[in-house]
Amino acid sequence: MATQSTPATLPLHEKKPLVRRAAPDRSQRVRHIVQGAFLLLNGWLGAQFYLWVRYFERGGEGLYVSRPAGVEGWLPIAGLMNTKYFLSTGRIPAVHPAAMFLFLGFVGMSLFLKKSFCSWLCPVGTFSEFLAGVGRRVWGRVFRIPRWLDISLRGLKYLLLAFFTVFIGGMSAEALDGFMASPYGLMADVKMLNFFREMGTTAAIVIALLVVASTLVENFWCRYLCPYGALMGLVSLASPVKIRRDVEACIDCSKCAKACPAGLKVDQLVQIRSAECTACMACVASCPAENALQLALAPRRAETARERWARRGLRPAVVVAVIAYFFLGAVLFARATNHWKSDLSKAAYMELVPQTDQLSHPAVQEH
């Protein structure tokens, strides 16, 4: 993995006077509002999708609602497969195209604004934050595991990412098209829903263990096991936006390092390059000093005056605007080009949805 961060080369200073912020930081309030809104959106999509599935399971009886293509945001593997297909053929896939557009939107978000998808939008990330809060109330704290073990465990998500990318990367365009056009591929979204509706004992135990682990170690799933987050982190290494510290304005209180959910040594660095940084701005919110810490673009060579430092920092409203640009841009572009919904008839859904539990993975069928 790439170098985590850029260390400060300036010598340590004596205790410096505090120049307090002119205005309180509202980044966390704004972020929590965005998280809540996206959580509600996902809840609405999930409820609509459930009603849509039940209509076909009942043989066409009851209320019919349209299939919300936005649920394909929960199909990152389909999004990756469709992206590979698009890059190989130049054709937009007919099945689960929304998965690809949302995938590309989230990747673009990470390319410009670090892993902001993980800390501002992802429902799993939001739930993980909630569980960490539960842990602080129940256990009195969350725990930091030894650094050597932490680094080793973080490698797991990259191994999972490598498995998926190597497997999908080795598939031809014809194989990708065949998989997505198979009954299993067509019903990938319904399969996902049924996993939660008909969860087995083993899956329930694993999820329960992950929930408990997330109350003990902050963002346990995201930090150690999420391959989607691993991909976003690698992409985010190229982001021009980073957490940047003004060594002269910093009073060396270390509040930023204590606030960082990823456990990064923000107080010892000039800029944070780590793939673990999610641009959550918790460190910025914790900083009591005016302009000492910013989520900011790289300074221009000509910019040396302290007054320009503040102008480089991204305010929460700008962060929200960038996130909205990539998310809504992907959705609106797909809708405008008529590539948002899968090209599958109602009759086909009527045949396939009730049979979803009997559908096997194509690779299993071949054997």
Each PLM stretch: what is its role?
Residues 1-258, 266-267, 275, 285, ...:
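Non-ligating segments of multi-cofactor redox enzymes
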Residues 278:
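Short alpha-helical catalytic segment bearing the HExxH-like zincin motif
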